[in-house]
Amino acid sequence: MSEKNPIVGLCQKASFLISAAQVDQCPPDEGLEVAFAGRSNAGKSSALNTLTHANLARTSKTPGRTQLLNFFALDDSRRLVDLPGYGYAKVPIPLKQHWQRHLEAYLSSRASLAGVFLMMDIRHPLTDFDRLMLDWAQASQLPIHVLMTKADKLAFGAAKNALLKVRREVQQGWGDVATLQLFSAPKRQGVDEAQMVLAQWLGLLDEEQEAFEEA
């Protein structure tokens, strides 16, 4: 599946574009972009690298960029955005307020933002950070796809039960915008499913369908 998914070849061409501390520093709001969010230690970097077949997260971790929105160009009209992954409960209140203000502004104002991938550690799901992200997505009617990461840390049955439990709560509170799946970067579990979501949000599946119909 991965070899046929158009997102793979496109992501291998990804290049760092710009880092932004606030919305007015972001690239022009045109085309399509997909953002990646996750609390510290939720596996965001591993998921981003695994889905894109590129070491994009390494760029985001360079000094001075860890608390910024990091943009990567896939082509002239498509981008990925690595959002800051704070140890949410541990950051100083002023920094937390600054981050909340600018991240909420980004999520609510970017017309080009097609969706958000939210990484949740399957062993510690629905943290305050996760709920905040889901609330913001719902307020903006923004699609959000939850990757329940580190699924390999639990036995298969336990992982499925955890998914069902979280899915019930998410559907009750944020079901109109949120979808969920199991994910493990080391085992490559759920990679194809997540890549299809990414390709759909970036309009790649529409292009493939148009090319097929024209042929």
Swiss-Prot record:
InterPro entries in alphabetical order: G_ENGB_dom, GTP-bd, GTP-bd_ribosome_bio_YsxC, P-loop_NTPase
Names of required cofactors: Mg(2+)
Keyword Transmembrane helix: no
Recorded GO CC terms: cytosol
Nucleotide-binding keyword on record: yes
GO molecular function term, any single one: GTP binding
Signal peptide interval: none
Protein's GO biological process: division septum assembly
UniProt xrefs under SUPFAM superfamilies: P-loop containing nucleoside triphosphate hydrolases
Positions annotated to bind Mg(2+): S45, T66
Coiled-coil portions: none
Sequence similarity: Belongs to the TRAFAC class TrmE-Era-EngA-EngB-Septin-like GTPase superfamily. EngB GTPase family.
Task performed by this protein: Necessary for normal cell division and for the maintenance of normal septation.
Protein name: Probable GTP-binding protein EngB
Organism, scientific name: Pseudomonas aeruginosa (strain ATCC 15692 / DSM 22644 / CIP 104116 / JCM 14847 / LMG 12228 / 1C / PRS 101 / PAO1)
Gene that encodes it: engB
